[in-house]
Amino acid sequence: MIRASLISLVAVAAIALTGVALGGSQSDLAAVRSATAPFHDLQAAMDAGYTFQLPDIFGDTCIANLDNPSAGAMGVHMVSLARVGNPSLDPTDPEALVYERRNDGSLKLVAVEYVVFDTGQARPSLFGVPFDWNDGSRYDLDPFYALHAWVWKPNPSEPAGIFNAWNPRVGCED
């Protein structure tokens, strides 16, 4: 009887702790959404120091997956150079905002991106997810680490989903 009670107690505690861990990550993402909600307004993003559209070396401001078009795109980036130069990572203060170009030419906020230049440091991570390394050549930049969080548009990609660099539901067609 005591053994069965202890097993039940351990099982309930494990479920409860798992719920806290999962809830914690959801609350972290909710905090990101709350902090970036004002940036649905492009003027608010510019007023906060985000520079409109980071083009790649081809002059494209909408970043598509050239190697695997079916993987989708990243979208149009607005970057804060002051935030990129800051070595600390704050989930509620991303280095870049990612927008999807709509059919009418307007932009809709779909994701945030965290960027850290590679200076030989350990690979950074947020939300328990390691950043992707990028050699920077497509953007005429030094090598950097990046992590996308699709907090405003669902990303069905596997295995990373919300943290995948590319979203098949985002395109760069004009």
Regions found by a protein language model. Give the residues of each.
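Positively charged n-region of N-terminal signal peptides that target proteins for export
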Residues: M1-A4
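Bacterial N-terminal signal peptides
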Residues: S8-L17
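Sec/Tat signal peptide C-region and signal peptidase I cleavage site
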Residues: V20-L22
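Primary mode marks residue(s) on the alpha4-beta5-alpha5 output face of response regulator receiver
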Residues: G24-D174
